[in-house]
Amino acid sequence: MSMVKSYVNPDQALQEVQSGNRVFVHGSAQTPHFLLQNLAAQKDRLRNVELVFITVKGDVCIDRPEFQDHFHINCLFVSESVRAAVNEGRADFIPVFLSDIPDLFRNSMPIDVALLQVSPPDEHGYCSLGASVDIARSAVNHARKIVAQVNPQVPRTHGDGLIHVDQLDQMVFHEAPLPEEDYSIKSGPDELKIGTIIAGMIDDGSTLQLGIGTIPD
């Protein structure tokens, strides 16, 4: 990969995406909305671009009917943001264990371009994948090209979640708040009652595994 010399505008950075490409999209709190919005604006030059991700947060815009000839979502988890598109047949779902996704990227679903949202580089040139490392680590390792939205509001997290600027083909600077979830508005009386009952069964010091949905929330 080429050494990044400076930040570029999103129009230039997203020229890395071409028709027929498979594109990984960073997910959850790291959803790169600025890149997705600018990619949507380039739809007229693109056909059959496959977008792969687990969960994305907020309005993904490119899941709308007017984009279906240009972008096709192939999600690895049906999150709220794309549920309507999957139900209406405008997007597909690949049922797969989370632990098997790195093998998919390595052998069955090669990634042409990865769209990330990362922290600014530190003094050693390392950016952080922030709050969503999960399958992004594997996507980074196997993508042919990497385009990163650099956002000062992305937290630096420890562990195997760093990427050096030498690995980035394009960097776009855009500061914006990360997507957030307000769980307080999703839980009703039934969920709260279930949670109260379960809480009474948990000993102090226990380790909990929590899933996704209104009850664990």
What feature does the model see in each segment?
Residues M1-D217:
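Conserved alpha/beta enzyme-core scaffold
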